[in-house]
Amino acid sequence: ISNRYSKTNWEGTMKSIKYGLAALFSLQLATTAVAAPTGQDLGANWCSDVKMHFYAGGPEAGGFAGIVAAGAMNAIRDTGADAEIIYSEWDFEKMVRQLRESIGLGVDAIGMMGHPGDDALMPLAKQAAEKGILMTYQNVDPAGVRARFGGGYVGANLATQGKALAREAIRQFGLKAGDHAIVMVPIGDYARAQREDGARIVFEEHGMTVTVVDGNPAYASDPNTVIPIFTAALSANPKTKIIVHPGSDIMNVAEGIAKAAGYGPNEILQIGFDTSPQIMTAFEKGYVHLTSDQQPFLQGYLPVLSLCQTAVLGTGAINQDTGAGFVDTNNYKAVKALADAGLR
């Protein structure tokens, strides 16, 4: 990558700065719709005048989405926000339709999953800004939208997280050039896919061979649908050493994948992202070996808090990288109780 900074890059950066300043000014103006506090003690329901829609991403009973929603619900209770949690079954088109409805209803603030990407979200973010609706984002960062219209991001740096997971797997498991990996990547949406694709890149740079299988995000709503997909991929690549899963909802069925393909405990490495009660059980039984924790509870709690603070206090948006390191066979017991409680 060249270190030279071209005129085009400079102009693009100056445009981003200009848009960021404009978005900040619009956020400050948006606070005028909410009564200003009259003292330093905000009280128990200090955000009760703020009507908010918060997007949890997946199905209401979903593992990852359930933890995100738990974080949001705790923040709603702590702030008194007048908030509704929206579930989308990881259907990005549904997210866009629901967002359009949220804007049409004229809510004060929206905590939005960034999965639909810049192109889909940009016109709706513009509408929200024109109506004075605050927006912030969680789990996937629509960086172009935020550069233009403002808003914070609470979630992991996806590309960095995926590459770090692959490097840790190489270190822990002694993977070497020529070893084979299967990586499930949500190919249709690179804003979301960059995490798993980052793992692929690191493996290939290490000299490993990688088979990519398409990970439609909708699989997360019914994870058992991926079992025959992985079974077929493993049958076609019997020397596979390691599988990379695209999230906790899929990795929840790691034991089923291994057994369906004829593997016993610890006979094939399975790694991925996030924790859950099922993943803790899979660690115990030898079917999951490494995961990168992105603290989904914070991805629910902090966006609600951020929107309340901006609406009531005029503060800037919260930006937080929630990546928290690795859970593996040596340390999973330290987080098991929280994972079993649906908090990690």
Would you name each region that the model predicts?
Residues 63-78, 161-165, 190-210, 225, ...:
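Short, solvent-exposed amphipathic alpha-helices that sit
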Residues 118-119, 124-160, 171, 276-289, ...:
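Flexible loop/hinge segments that line or gate small-molecule binding clefts
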Residues 77-89, 180-182, 203-223:
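Short beta-strand elements in bilobed, periplasmic/extracellular small-molecule ligand-binding domains
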Residues 46-47, 95, 152-179, 194, ...:
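Hydrophobic alpha-helical segments within soluble ligand-binding/sensing domains
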Residues 1-51, 126-131, 343-344:
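Short, low-complexity disordered leader/linker segments with a strong preference
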Residues 109-110, 114-130, 199, 214, ...:
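Hydrophobic alpha-helical
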